[in-house]
């Protein structure tokens, strides 16, 4: 085998080529690192945006659950409002009928039976949370009363309900029918 010996000129040329390759490699490595860092920053920003979006969606969902729960509670609380509203005219008619003065024994018996039915109806409504609105002698409140007449009466102060023409009712804390009243001027 023959060995080729490199001349110092060839060795210098090889070293120069190696240095050039190494410099190119370092330059490429720095460019790659810069590109990688940009990509990392871009992905981090995207990740942060997605995390924020997830947090907003979670908050929206929690708000939705709270609203839905509140709506269900409200529906359950006032579920009987429609039925109660339909029964109020019948209750008014019972009260008018009970105000009649019986003139014979048969009418008295009928009136007693009606009083029992009336009490049962009032008790059933009370169990559902229905209560009459107090009106006579109270200060007029447009949230509870509907003024249909104004009168002048020295026995009452100004803006006081003098007479109740039709009873008003509340279901729990909601007015289902305001009292129709006469108000003192």
Swiss-Prot record:
Annotated spans, Disordered: 1-37
Family matches, as InterPro entries: GrpE, GrpE_coiled_coil, GrpE_head
Coiled coil: none
Main localization of the protein described in the UniProt heading: cytoplasm
Pfam families: GrpE
GO molecular function, one term: unfolded protein binding
Keyword terms, alphabetized: Chaperone, Cytoplasm, Stress response
Disulfide bonds: none
Superkingdom of source: Bacteria
Classification via Gene3D superfamilies: 3.90.20.20, Head domain of nucleotide exchange factor GrpE
Gene Ontology CC: cytoplasm
Cellular localisation: Cytoplasm
Biological processes annotated in GO: protein folding
Quaternary state and interactors: Homodimer.
Family: Belongs to the GrpE family.
Chain's role: Participates actively in the response to hyperosmotic and heat shock by preventing the aggregation of stress-denatured proteins, in association with DnaK and GrpE. It is the nucleotide exchange factor for DnaK and may function as a thermosensor. Unfolded proteins bind initially to DnaJ; upon interaction with the DnaJ-bound protein, DnaK hydrolyzes its bound ATP, resulting in the formation of a stable complex. GrpE releases ADP from DnaK; ATP binding to DnaK triggers the release of the substrate protein, thus completing the reaction cycle.
NCBIfam families: PRK14140.1
Entry protein name: Protein GrpE
Taxonomic source organism: Bacillus pumilus (strain SAFR-032)
Gene: grpE
């Amino acid at each position: 085998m023959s060995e080729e010996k490199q001349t110092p000129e060839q060795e210098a040329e090889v070293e120069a080529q190696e240095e050039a390759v190494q410099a190119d490699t370092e330059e490429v490595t720095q460019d790659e690192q810069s590109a990688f860092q940009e990509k990392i920053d871009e992905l981090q920003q995207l990740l942060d945006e997605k995390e924020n979006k997830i947090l907003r969606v979670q908050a929206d969902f929690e708000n939705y659950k709270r609203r839905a729960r509140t709506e269900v509670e409200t529906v359950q609380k006032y579920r009987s409002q429609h039925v109660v509203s339909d029964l109020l005219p019948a209750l008014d008619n019972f009260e008018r009928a009970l105000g009649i003065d019986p003139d014979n024994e048969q009418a008295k018996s009928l009136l007693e039976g009606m009083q029992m039915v009336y009490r049962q109806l009032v008790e059933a409504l009370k169990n559902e949370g229905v209560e009459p609105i107090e009106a006579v002698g109270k200060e007029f409140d447009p949230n509870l009363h509907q003024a249909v007449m104004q009168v002048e009466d020295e026995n009452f102060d100004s803006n006081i309900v003098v007479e109740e023409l039709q009873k008003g009712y509340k279901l729990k804390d909601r007015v289902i029918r305001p009292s129709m009243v006469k108000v003192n001027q």
